[in-house]
Regions:
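Short, well-ordered, aromatic-rich surface patches in folded extracellular/luminal domains
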Residues: 5, 21-40, 88, 95-154
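Short, solvent-exposed loop/hinge segments that bridge or flank secondary-structure elements
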Residues: 39-52
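Acidic/histidine-rich, surface-exposed loop or edge segments in extracytoplasmic proteins
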Residues: 59-72
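Sec-dependent bacterial lipoprotein signal peptides
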Residues: 1-19
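Hydrophobic residues embedded in beta-strands of well-ordered beta-sheets
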Residues: 55-58, 123
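A short, structured loop/turn motif at beta-sheet edges
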Residues: 52, 75-84, 116-122
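Mature extracytoplasmic domains of secretory-pathway proteins
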Residues: 72-99
Length: 154
């Protein structure tokens, strides 16, 4: 009986260690995180995107008409900022989410999206209704919205 408890303990320990390693390796393998919003029926800057990697954070704004001149800017990404973004997707739950959740931009409600690109070329993008993010993304989206808020489209 005691031997079975010890075996069970080691099995649980092994599973926990394996899960942590896979999450940690995913964290280390993130190459880029992209986030954006869009509104189909709008005037002015209807699309706002931010792209974050270990070197730069790039911002862009665009509209649907030619009268709206697209804007772009970029700043250097600090190590602490990059680490804080990468840690947000420090699990496999993001990659298990469907590509589309709900009805993004239906009735001009707007859409938000997050895309994670890994060093091996794998990428996954999730699009969802504006300010109706899935529970798995709530902390990630809060941080990404904060970063995107620095994008001043004029």
């Amino acid at each position: 009986m005691k031997l079975k408890r010890v075996q069970l303990f080691f099995v649980i320990l092994l599973v926990t260690a394996t899960s942590s390693c896979s999450n940690e390796s995913l964290y280390r393998n993130v190459a880029q995180v992209n986030y954006g919003t869009s509104f189909g029926m709008c005037v002015g800057y209807c699309k706002r995107d931010v792209s974050i990697d270990s070197v730069y954070t790039s911002y862009s704004c665009a509209g649907w008409s030619k009268e709206v001149e697209p804007t772009q800017s970029k700043v250097q990404t600090t190590k602490s900022a990059w680490d804080s973004v990468k840690v947000l997707i420090n699990n496999k739950a993001f990659f298990e989410l469907p590509a589309t959740i709900g009805c993004p931009d239906c009735a001009d409600g707007g859409a938000e999206w997050v895309e994670v690109k890994l060093l091996n070329g794998t990428a996954h993008k999730v699009v969802f209704e504006y300010y109706n993010e899935p529970q798995q993304l709530q902390s990630s989206i809060a941080k990404l919205r904060q970063i995107a808020g620095k994008n001043e489209c004029k």
